[in-house]
Regions:
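Short alpha-helical segments that sit at the start of domains
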Residues: 1-14
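Short, hydrophobic-biased segments on the C-terminal half of alpha helices
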Residues: 15, 46-47
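A short alpha-helical element within helix-turn-helix/winged-helix DNA-binding domains
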Residues: 29-37
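Alpha-helical residues within the helix-turn-helix
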Residues: 33, 50-51
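Key DNA-contact positions within bacterial/archaeal DNA-binding proteins
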Residues: 40
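Beta-hairpin "wing" of winged helix-turn-helix
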Residues: 53-62, 66-67
Length: 132
């Protein structure tokens, strides 16, 4: 079973929460409370999402945030990249040298799985996740 990190899970939950309120400036504290994410962790995640131009923040005492792009332009892959998570299923699909690479039973199937995984993440956009 593939298990992604809490950081990525929180990033996806937070950005979906924001996308579900397209005409609002969303308060960071509201996201943290609603999605049960620590506010300090959420602020770090939001900083990464802002650096990659997925979110726009309004600085101040309250800390407001909104999408920087249309939901149909934000992919799950981009969110995953923004929080600096590894996109590799195994070391061999990452390109790390392995002496058994040419004599391995699983290299082909894992390579295909990696390509399908990446393609799926790139096709899945926020507008498909957050439907009104």
């Amino acid at each position: 079973m593939i298990k992604l990190s809490k950081k990525w899970d929180y990033a996806l939950k937070a950005i979906c929460y924001i996308a579900d309120r397209p005409l609002e400036l969303v308060h960071i504290k509201d996201i943290a409370t609603s999605e049960e994410i620590s506010e300090s962790m959420l602020r770090r995640i939001i900083a990464n999402l802002e650096k990659t131009w997925l979110l726009r923040t309004v600085k101040g005492r309250n800390g407001w945030v909104q999408l920087a792009k249309s939901p149909n332009l934000i992919t799950v892959y981009a969110i995953l990249e923004a929080v600096w998570e590894e996109l590799w299923l195994t070391d061999c699909t990452k390109g790390i040298y392995c002496e058994k690479k040419w004599d391995c039973y699983t290299t082909g199937v894992l390579g295909n799985l990696q390509r399908w995984f990446n393609a799926l993440l790139k096709m899945q956009t926020l507008d498909k996740i957050v439907k009104k």
